A protein has these predicted regions:
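FIC/Doc superfamily catalytic core
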Residues: 1-151
């Protein structure tokens, strides 16, 4: 997304940026892009809690960055996991969370993640590995998601 390269001075750890990014990514596809979901899903939190939980996640991420609480890769991966867990949008949550993680790791001086790259021919196996890594994150084990992000 070319416009993300011209965002100097933009704080990505804000709700405004989170929603604007989703709108920019998917605005040509879905009229509701950049708006929170209004219904429950089999993944994610209650829609009424999205802003509360998202605000907490972004404050935590800012704290992790300011205090060097974790290595840069882990901060970005934890942010990614939290965004997917909250699931603020009806669709596009994973792609959106991966881009935000890439933007954050780049801002922290690292290289963007490969997120499994193109090495697996079977997209089903790639997705299964990604979902398994996210589930490990649900148990506070971020090693599989870190490994997947850099694979």
């Amino acid at each position: 997304m070319a416009w993300t390269q011209h965002r100097r001075g933009t704080d990505i750890l804000t709700e405004g940026f989170v929603f604007a990014l989703h709108g920019r990514m998917f605005g040509d596809v879905w009229s509701w892009a950049g708006s929170t979901r209004k219904t429950g899903k089999n993944i994610g939190i209650d829609p009424a809690q999205i802003h509360v939980q998202l605000g907490g996640l972004l404050r935590n991420a800012r704290y992790w960055v300011e205090r060097d609480s974790f290595a840069s890769d882990e901060i970005a991966v934890r942010l990614h996991h939290g965004l997917v867990a909250i699931h603020p949008f009806p669709n596009g949550n994973g792609r959106h969370a991966r881009l935000i993680a890439d933007l954050l790791i780049t801002e922290l001086g690292g290289a963007p993640f490969s997120w499994g790259g193109q090495t697996l021919c079977d997209i089903g196996a790639l997705r299964a590995g990604y979902v398994a890594a996210l589930r490990a994150g649900d148990r506070h084990d971020f090693a599989p998601l870190l490994a997947f992000a850099r694979s």
